[in-house]
Swiss-Prot record:
Subunit comment: Oligomeric complex.
Function: The coatomer is a cytosolic protein complex that binds to dilysine motifs and reversibly associates with Golgi non-clathrin-coated vesicles, which further mediate biosynthetic protein transport from the ER, via the Golgi up to the trans Golgi network. Coatomer complex is required for budding from Golgi membranes, and is essential for the retrograde Golgi-to-ER transport of dilysine-tagged proteins. The zeta subunit may be involved in regulating the coat assembly and, hence, the rate of biosynthetic protein transport due to its association-dissociation properties with the coatomer complex.
Basic and acidic residues bias locations: 1-12
Low complexity composition bias: residue spans: 13-34
Region described as Disordered: 1-34
GO BP field: intra-Golgi vesicle-mediated transport; intracellular protein transport; retrograde vesicle-mediated transport, Golgi to endoplasmic reticulum
Organism classification: Eukaryota, Metazoa, Chordata, Craniata, Vertebrata
Primary subcellular site in the record, as a coarse category: cytoplasm
Membrane topology classification: Peripheral membrane protein
Pfam families xrefs: Clat_adaptor_s
Protein's UniProt name: Coatomer subunit zeta-2
InterPro entries given in the database record: AP_mu_sigma_su, Coatomer_zeta, Longin-like_dom_sf
Family statement drawn from the similarity comment of this UniProt entry: Belongs to the adaptor complexes small subunit family.
Origin: domain of life: Eukaryota
Amino acid sequence: MQRPEAWPRPHPGEGAAAAQAGGPAPPARAGEPSGLRLQEPSLYTIKAVFILDNDGRRLLAKYYDDTFPSMKEQMVFEKNVFNKTSRTESEIAFFGGMTIVYKNSIDLFLYVVGSSYENELMLMSVLTCLFESLNHMLRKNVEKRWLLENMDGAFLVLDEIVDGGVILESDPQQVIQKVNFRADDGGLTEQSVAQVLQSAKEQIKWSLLK
C-alpha cells in the first residue's frame, strides 16, 4: 500500500537566501500548515508516542530513536513524565530537553514526544489525530478498558499516523479509512497482534526485574 508523502522541511537558508536577495520568502507548500516551516533539512519527526493508565503504567508505547534504548530507560522516562504532568491542567511540558504534548481521557494519558526544536503545533496535531482516531475506532469513550480490548487496532492507528518517527498523517478520517483497509489484510493484522504480544512480554519482564 502506498503511503502518503510526509511533509518535508525546507533546506537551510531556503528562506534566508531570498530575503538577502531582496525577494520574498518562498510560500508554504500545498498541504503544509501555516507557520510550521522549520529550518532543519529533514522531515517532521517525533521521538515517541505512549499511552499510560491513571497510575502511570504503560499500555501502549513506540519509540522511534535511540534516546532511550532500553526498556528500563523508557519506563523510567515514562514514569517521570507522568509524575510531572498527571496533576497539571496544561497540555505541554518541557522535560529532559524534549517537548511533550499530552492529553488526559478518563483513565488514560496520551503523550507525544518530540525534540526541543520540534514545533509544538505539529506535535499537537499528531496527538489530536491519535485521540480522535481511537475515539472513532472504539466508538466509545477513549478509556483503558476499551483500549485493552482493541489494542491491535490501536497499533494500526498509530502506524498510519507515524512511521519510523516520520509524521505521515494528521487527518483522523484518512487514518480510519486506511486502518479499515489494512484490517482486511490478514498478514498486517497478525503483525499488529505480534506488536501487542511483544509489548506485553516486555512489560512482564520489566515488572519481574523491579
